């Protein structure tokens, strides 16, 4: 059987060669009488008929160039022809496409004169790049980790050195590690390498919080800061370029300078940390001492006999002596000896203004933290059925108490009050957090154990509107007597509770069940009960009259028409399953978050040091909110400039933008277009944007981009710029560790080859942004490098390094080019985008 097949293949190949030879001999004999046929379509290739051409097109080989760069084995499998016939076809395609031939250097130079160049908006930067961003090339841009995205010096951070939790200002942290003698000058500031420091980082897409390494701590001086005050009393003091995670129709990173009152800044509901062991009785005693203890004499004063008995008993067990108890006017003062002072440490000499949360409590588990807070509440807290209030004169202690509450998943409110010249910090807990606080009340010795439920919800109206927009895609039963239904279907500007969110979650689960039932009915050939209007399938080519008929009478009888209707309904079911799953994922994510409304935003004079932690893996750390470094200003400017006519530095073309980190901002495009003399609405219409959610999706979008490029090729606005921002984000997130490096680089090489092919075949400019990572062995010079390794380094035609310069300027350095010398250019970011 195998021999028979082999003979058949040989006969088939021989026939194909004979057919090709006949064509060649005929064309040879007729050369003098007939002009040589020009190959412009697949059917013009020798041995390619309509059926073979259709197979090739279905597989994506729809141009002469695509055939020319294919392998014989690929065509053999796709078209069902022999390898020899495939080779003949490829050779003909290469001759027609002029691929695989050599030319003299002077001819090649003439060909390069056809390369287009897009102005960056800056003459200095254009000169550095040899006239602008070139077509038929990949230009890579990456930036430093400082870039003006930092925190004010008094910003509190928490981190772990090995396994020990530290809680201090970012300035104190910097000086602690700089004192080890490893500070290095970097650009306009300084950087200190970190070896054993870990922080917790947040993935906005999944809601996952994980422990990760910090590589450097960096500082520089700035003149201005943004002060963002939140409705719960929190104050963020950060540089204007610093991205802040907000909820705007979904999670987005927005520069601090673009935050407005009413925006919702997103934080983490429960802050994680490594936990050490501490006895609950010790934690409770420390809470009492921080609340009511004094240093001179070293003692605790209380009016509660129960608390007095606990303190005496604890000291007897812990320190081996019975403390002296003085009774004055109904108050008990318990006096401690030197042995107690020794283990209390600095707390034994502190006063009301200098007290802090002890380090052993910062490192404790949730149960011990609850015991400490219970001790503090019993000592100096205020509690009713509807509110919890903790007051202190110490700013450090207030910050520490907030941190401990966040460890338990409680987000308190903060306010300040000045009494007789002294500032007091008031921390209070209301709303749904009161229920969570009951885990503290369980440890209390003198306070009641239950609080009222309900109150103001923790979920904002913006979340309800976002979910309501998704819910409007369905047609489900009305529920006018339910709050959840009103949140989704009416414009109600109210915060809602966990109970309401859970009911909304049930609606979307019901939608998924009904979609599944409809799918099963269609597969059985029955008329389905749809959880969406029948009119939804008009988008698939059906008329309103047809849809009305199907809704009334059921699926059509004619098999071919029935198949089309079923196919359209299944497509709509699949789409709506994605909508319902997005809603459920959003709900699950919202449960891990806190939403803080912005009360005010003010730009203030600062003229001091700002600091930043460098987290190479994820570019953000928890408390304060995240940090993600982007190099998108130049990309936005190019997306506008490419649309200008050639005499004004453009190519009169359209743009494709693949967005991997949700950084494309149409508002910025409109601003640049207006200031460059272009119609902002028309400018937006010429930009095609797609969000990539993983590396496979990113690579698929490059294939889809080719379809748009072909479609627009003969129009008055052909695609001339393809932006990928950023190139490596998904590859880094999905391929973690050395064990996956080879697979990642192989996949990246394929991705870059596809981008190069688009640039060459269609004469477009490919512009990619990249991230940086720390070089752990760098003690001098630039302590960062772009990610992507040698694969990206050798694939990018030009590589440009961006850094922050003086007086708000930016510096671009050309570090790799096949034909241009290294050099630098200085430019600014303004309303026009990039300019001199």
Curated annotation (Swiss-Prot):
Sequence ranges of Acidic residues compositional bias: 15-24
Keyword Membrane: no
Listed Basic and acidic residues bias regions: 31-41
Keywords from the named record: ATP-binding, Autocatalytic cleavage, DNA damage, DNA recombination, DNA-binding, Endonuclease, Hydrolase, Intron homing, Nuclease, Nucleotide-binding, Protein splicing
Name of the protein in its database record: DNA repair and recombination protein RadA
GO molecular function annotations of the record: ATP binding; ATP-dependent DNA damage sensor activity; damaged DNA binding; endonuclease activity
Region of interest: Disordered: 15-41
Protein task: Involved in DNA repair and in homologous recombination. Binds and assemble on single-stranded DNA to form a nucleoprotein filament. Hydrolyzes ATP in a ssDNA-dependent manner and promotes DNA strand exchange between homologous DNA molecules.
Record has Ribonucleoprotein as a keyword: no
Recorded family membership: Belongs to the eukaryotic RecA-like protein family.
Modifications made to the protein after synthesis: This protein undergoes a protein self splicing that involves a post-translational excision of the intervening region (intein) followed by peptide ligation.
Cross-referenced InterPro entries: DNA_recomb/repair_Rad51_C, DNA_recomb/repair_RadA, DNA_repair_Rad51/TF_NusA_a-hlx, Hint_dom_C, Hint_dom_N, Hint_dom_sf, Hlx-hairpin-Hlx_DNA-bd_motif, Homing_endonucl
Pfam families to which the protein is assigned, alphabetical: HHH_5, Intein_splicing, LAGLIDADG_3, Rad51
Further remark: The intein interrupts the ATP-binding site.
GO biological process, one term: DNA repair
Residues annotated as domain DOD-type homing endonuclease: 285-410
């Amino acid at each position: 059987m195998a021999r028979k097949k082999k003979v058949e293949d040989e006969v088939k190949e021989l026939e194909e060669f004979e057919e090709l030879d006949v064509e060649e001999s005929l064309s040879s004999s007729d050369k003098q009488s007939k002009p040589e046929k020009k190959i412009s379509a697949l059917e013009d290739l020798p041995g390619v008929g309509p059926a073979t051409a259709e197979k090739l097109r279905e597989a994506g080989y729809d141009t002469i160039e695509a055939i020319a760069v294919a392998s014989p084995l690929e065509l053999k499998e796709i078209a069902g022809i022999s390898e020899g016939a495939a080779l003949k076809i490829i050779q003909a395609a290469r001759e027609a496409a002029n691929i695989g031939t050599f030319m003299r250097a002077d001819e090649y130079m003439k060909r390069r004169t056809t390369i287009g160049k897009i102005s960056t908006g800056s003459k200095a930067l254009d000169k550095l790049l040899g006239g602008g961003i070139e077509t038929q090339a990949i230009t890579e841009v990456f930036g430093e980790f400082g870039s003006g995205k930092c925190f004010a010096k008094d910003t509190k951070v928490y981190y772990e050195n090995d396994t020990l939790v530290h809680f201090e200002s970012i300035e104190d942290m910097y000086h602690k590690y700089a004192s080890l003698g490893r500070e290095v000058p970097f650009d306009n500031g300084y950087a200190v390498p970190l070896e054993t420091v870990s922080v917790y980082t947040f993935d906005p897409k999944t809601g996952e919080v994980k422990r990760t390494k910090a590589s450097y701590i960096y500082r520089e001086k700035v003149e201005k800061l943004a002060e963002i005050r939140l409705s719960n009393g929190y104050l963020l003091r950060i540089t204007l370029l610093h991205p802040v995670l907000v909820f705007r129709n979904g999670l987005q990173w927005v520069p601090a300078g673009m935050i407005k009152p009413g925006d919702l800044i997103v934080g983490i509901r429960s802050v994680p940390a490594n936990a050490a062991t501490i006895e609950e009785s010790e934690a409770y005693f420390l809470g009492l001492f921080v609340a009511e203890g004094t240093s001179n004499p070293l003692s605790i004063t209380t009016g509660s006999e129960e608390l007095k008995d606990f303190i005496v008993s604890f000291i007897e067990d812990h320190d081996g002596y019975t403390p002296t108890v003085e009774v004055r006017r109904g108050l008990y003062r318990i006096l401690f000896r030197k042995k107690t002072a020794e283990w209390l440490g600095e707390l034994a000499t502190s006063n009301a203004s200098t007290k802090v949360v002890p380090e052993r409590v910062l490192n404790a588990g949730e149960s011990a933290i609850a015991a400490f807070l219970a001790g503090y509440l019993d000592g100096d807290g205020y509690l009713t059925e509807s509110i919890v209030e903790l007051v202190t004169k110490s700013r450090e202690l207030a910050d520490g108490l907030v941190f401990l509450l966040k460890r338990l998943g409680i987000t308190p409110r903060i306010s300040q009050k000045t009494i007789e010249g002294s500032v007091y910090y008031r921390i209070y807990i209301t709303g749904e957090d009161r229920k969570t606080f009951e885990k503290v009340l369980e440890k209390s010795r003198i306070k009641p154990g239950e609080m009222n439920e309900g109150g103001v919800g923790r979920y904002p109206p913006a979340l309800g509107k976002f979910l309501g927009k998704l819910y409007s895609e369905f047609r489900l039963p009305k529920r006018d007597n339910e709050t959840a239904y009103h949140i989704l279907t009416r414009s109600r500007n109210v915060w809602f509770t966990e109970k309401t969110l859970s009911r909304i979650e049930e609606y979307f689960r019901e939608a998924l069940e009904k979609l599944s039932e409809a799918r099963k009915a269609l597969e059985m050939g029955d008329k389905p009960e749809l959880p969406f209007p029948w009119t939804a399938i008009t988008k698939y080519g059906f008329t309103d009259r047809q849809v009305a008929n199907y809704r009334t009478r059921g699926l059509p009888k004619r098999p071919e028409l029935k198949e089309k209707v079923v196919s359209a309904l299944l497509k709509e079911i699949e789409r709506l399953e994605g909508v319902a799953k997005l809603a459920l994922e959003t709900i699950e994510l919202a449960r891990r978050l806190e939403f803080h409304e912005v009360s005010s935003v003010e730009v203030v004079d600062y003229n001091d040091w700002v600091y930043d932690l460098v987290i190479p893996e994820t570019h953000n750390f928890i408390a304060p909110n995240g940090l993600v470094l982007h190099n998108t200003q130049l990309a936005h400017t190019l997306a506008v400039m490419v649309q200008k006519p050639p005499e004004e530095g453009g190519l009169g073309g359209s743009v494709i933008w693949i967005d991997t980190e949700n950084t494309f901002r149409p508002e910025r495009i409109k601003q640049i277009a207006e200031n460059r003399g272009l119609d902002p609405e028309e400018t937006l219409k010429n930009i095609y944007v797609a969000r990539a959610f993983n590396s496979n999706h990113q690579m698929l979008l490059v294939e889809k981009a080719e379809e748009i490029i072909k479609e627009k090729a003969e129009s008055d606005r052909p695609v001339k710029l393809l932006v990928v921002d950023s190139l490596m984000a998904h590859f880094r997130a999905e391929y973690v560790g050395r064990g996956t490096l080879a697979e990642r680089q192989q996949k990246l090489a394929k991705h870059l080859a596809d981008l190069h092919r688009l640039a060459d075949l269609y004469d477009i400019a490919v512009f990619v942004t990249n991230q940086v990572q720390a070089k752990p062995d760098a003690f001098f010079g630039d302590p960062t490098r772009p990610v992507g390794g040698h694969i990206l380094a050798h694939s990018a035609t030009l590589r440009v390094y961006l850094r922050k310069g003086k007086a708000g300027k930016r510096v671009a350095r050309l570090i790799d080019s096949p034909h241009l010398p290294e050099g630098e250019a200085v430019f600014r970011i303004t309303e026009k985008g990039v300019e001199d």
